Amino acid sequence: MSFKIDDYIKGDAFEYLPRMPDKCADLVFTSCPDLSQTEFDKTSDGIRSYQEFQKKATKEFARIVKTDGFVVICQTDRRVNGSILSNHMHYAKCLEEEGMHLKDYKIVVRNEVGKRDMYYFTFQHMLVYTYKGTITRKGDWLRDIYVDKQNKVLNQSVWSQDFCDYVIENLTNDGALVVDPFAGVGPVLWSAKRLGRHYWGAELEEKFYNDEFKQFRTTLPV
């Protein structure tokens, strides 16, 4: 399967990522599928398989990002089997094993603060990794907590365009290539397109694939 920029495809990211050139992306900005959104169950074997899936993804991210580019993973942890499945710590470990460094870290509040939930946290961990990239620390980027007004499409939370713009504008320049391999309805890709960046992304599930970004052009209130 071929790879071309400015493309949002319906398909398996792992069929395309290996075809992407080394060090081609300025920004990989994504939220990998949650355990509940995969084929893996909550058994010890299932969780190990899920973590291998996460590791496989981060190895590709670390390969395709430029030396001065960034990998941004924004994901929540989960309560599973009476303990915490610390997704953000596992992603950090995997990226650091690839030689990347944690350049910045923020909390992204995705629900109202203080909401009570048995299984889901109300915030996401935003990890910003790079090999040698630099960030201009000024203005809004200095905040360490970002309150995002997210919407739901079925069981998937959708980042606001304000949040996507915030990350892309602070970490890339015009003409940069922004990649979201687990694009969902495509908020990162739509933001990149509007901001004059190149983009590439994939979504496996028909129920989330937002062909030609139609939901952003019409009904999705993000």
Regions found by a protein language model. Give the residues of each.
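Short intrinsically disordered terminal tails
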Residues: M1-S2, L220-V222
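Conserved phosphoryl-transfer catalytic core
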Residues: R217
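Conserved SAM-binding loop
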Residues: E212-F213
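Core catalytic lobe of class I
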Residues: M1-Y209
